[in-house]
Structure formats: C-alpha cells, structure tokens
UniProtKB/Swiss-Prot annotation:
Function: Exopeptidase that catalyzes the hydrolytic cleavage of multi-L-arginyl-poly-L-aspartic acid (cyanophycin; a water-insoluble reserve polymer) into aspartate-arginine dipeptides.
Gene3D superfamilies: 3.40.50.880
GO molecular function terms listed in the Swiss-Prot or TrEMBL record: peptidyl-dipeptidase activity; serine-type peptidase activity
Residue runs in coiled coils: none
Pfam families registered for this protein in UniProt: Peptidase_S51
Keyword terms, alphabetized: Hydrolase, Protease, Serine protease
Annotated gene: cphB
A single BP term in Gene Ontology: proteolysis
Enzyme Commission (EC) number: 3.4.15.6
Active site: S178, E196, H220
Name of protein: Cyanophycinase
Family: Belongs to the peptidase S51 family.
Reaction equation(s) it catalyzes: [L-4-(L-arginin-2-N-yl)aspartate](n) + H2O = [L-4-(L-arginin-2-N-yl)aspartate](n-1) + L-4-(L-arginin-2-N-yl)aspartate
Length: 322
C-alpha cells in the first residue's frame, strides 16, 4: 500500500524542495511502517488498462555524443523528422542549461521542432499555455536531476494529468533518464544506500508520478551497486515489479506489454510474485532481510520481458517504427 500526504496540507511554499524537505521525514516513517493507514491513495487515481504509448526508462548517462543509440531511437519512435519533442528539464538544478542541452541534441539528430517546457513552480504546471504546448508533443522527455524536485513540481497538477493521458492513449511517447526514469512508478526510490545487505533502512521511498503504476524503477543500477536497495524497496512493496536499469541502457515499455532492453548495459528484473516468506515486518530497520523465492532476471540488449506473462525472450524482434 502506498500513502500520500496531500500537498494542500502545507500549502504552496516558495520552493517545491521545501515541501519535500518537510514531508520527507513523514514519508520515511510511513514507508517504513506499512501498517499505518494515512490517506490511502484511491485505487482509481492511477488505474488504467495499460499504456498505448511507448515509455522509455533510461538508466542515466546515456550516450549524447557518438552513436546516441537511445536518444536516436526515442526521436525515431516519436515521429522522426516530423516529431515534436517536449523537454521537461525540471529535475535539474540548472533546468535552462539542461533544456538547451537536450534541445541541441534532438535538433542535431534531425528533429525539426523541440520545445523546452520549463516548469519552475507548480503554477507553471497549471497554465493553459503550457498544457497547449504539451498537447502538440509527439515525444516528451524528462531529464535527470532530483526526482523529489520533479515529483514535487508535477504531482497532482493538470500538466501531469495531461501527460499521463497522452501517454496512456498513445498520443505521445515518453522518455525519462535518471531521475526522469525514477519517477515513472506510483512509488519511487527517493534516495538510499549501497554496499549493504538488503534492509529496511537502506532505501527511502516517496510518491512517484504513476505513469507506470505497477513498476518500481531504479537507475545507474549496477554502476552504483543498487541491487540491495531495489530488493529492500520491493520488500516494502511486493505488489510492484522492480526494474533496475544500468547507465546508457533503456527499458522500453511497449504498448503490447513487452519490456525491451536497448543499450550497452543490462536491465535487472526483481519479481516478487512467488515470494513465500519475508521477515520485513518483524525485524528492526537496520537488520538484514530474509526473502524466500525472489525471482531475478538480468537482460541485455535485445532481450525482452513480458509484463503480462512474466516470461523472458532472448533477442526479440523489434517492432516497426510508429
């Protein structure tokens, strides 16, 4: 169960970071105490029957200079030369510079129209002009940075509602790298440690954007030794599928329910469906976790995972471009 503390309880502060700084200790306490029942999210909030638009979750540090395999694929799937790419650089501490970086990359790849959607505060995400610009986009790209900042800016705003609608209805494809990938689930990893055995204190969880409600994403995965923290997160939310994505690697969530791997690293699937026992509810926060029958897959470029049947396929055939 995931719980939300409504932003309205603290009002609109000058900075979304202040909101999350205020809420983070509360969210940590709630996520480490699953028996608490504070304002549970309505099941209808993120309920959908599957997304018709491609979602590309990138593990960060994607190639921006040479082959640009992942970013080129994103542009191709968004419509090629005729694509309209909207860049949301709001997770970055320097959103203007980040926006210009991806603007120049996508233009260099060949996209004629790239729009930088600067969301500096929650009021920006409510403007009709911003919604109109988003509605024209065939591809939407969320940059890296701080996933807490991005979530604080977009969560429960008209911009997020429209973004989800466009992706779920197949009107746009969505790409997110690093923090932009971490926010895709209903629950997201806000921060955490590494180089430890899985335990309840290893990861801090927060509310994501709910674009892929059944998935919990981690990024820079093997590069930063994050398997233990993803397992710790999945132990707290065994109804989610853990997806750990390496740098310069992409998990492509296709409309047909296939997860396809693209890039030079790997994607790790942590599947808790068959877990028969965990001591999660019975140990102190710093004690190691026991988890029985946790299933793990490591997939490389071209491999696929069926999100409906939970079967893996080696080097599956690429679909035609949209």
């Amino acid at each position: 169960m995931l719980y939300r503390i409504p932003v309205s309880t603290v009002g609109y502060w000058h900075s979304p970071w202040q909101i999350h700084q205020f809420l983070l200790p509360i969210e940590r306490f709630i996520h480490r105490n699953p028996m608490l029942q504070l304002d549970p999210i309505s099941k209808t909030t993120h309920q959908h029957s599957g997304h018709k638009g491609l979602v590309m979750a990138i593990g960060g540090a994607e190639d921006k200079v040479r082959g640009r395999q992942i970013l080129t694929t994103f542009c191709q799937r968004a419509g090629g030369l005729d694509a309209v790419i909207g860049v949301i650089p709001s997770a970055s501490r320097e959103p203007d510079a980040m926006g210009r970086l991806y603007h120049d990359i996508f233009r260099d790849i060949g996209v004629r129209e790239v729009d930088i959607l600067l969301v500096g505060d929650r009021a920006d995400a409510e403007q009709e002009e911003m919604l109109a610009r988003l509605s024209r986009c065939t591809g939407i790209f969320m940059s890296g940075g701080d996933q807490l900042r991005l979530s604080a800016l977009l969560d429960e705003t008209p911009l997020l509602y429209q973004l989800r609608h466009q992706v779920w209805e197949g009107k746009s494809i969505l790409g997110g790298t690093s923090a932009g990938a971490a926010v895709l689930g209903e629950c997201m990893i806000a921060s955490g440690g590494s180089n430890e055995a899985p335990n309840r204190s290893l990861v801090d969880l927060a509310t994501g954007l709910g674009i892929l409600p059944d998935v919990l994403v981690d990024q820079h995965f093997h590069n930063r030794n994050r398997l233990a923290r993803l397992i710790s997160a999945i132990s707290a939310h065994p109804d989610k599928l853990g997806v750990g994505i390496d740098e310069d690697t992409c998990a492509m969530f296709e409309a047909d329910g296939t997860l396809r791997v693209l890039g030079r690293g790997s994607v790790t699937i942590v599947d808790p469906r068959d877990v028969s026992y965990t001591n999660y509810a019975h140990v102190d926060v710093n004690e190691p976790l026991s988890i029985y029958n946790l299933r793990l897959h490591i997939l490389s470029d071209g491999d696929c995972y069926n999100l409906r049947t939970h079967q893996v396929q080696h080097k599956c055939i690429l679909p035609p471009l949209n």
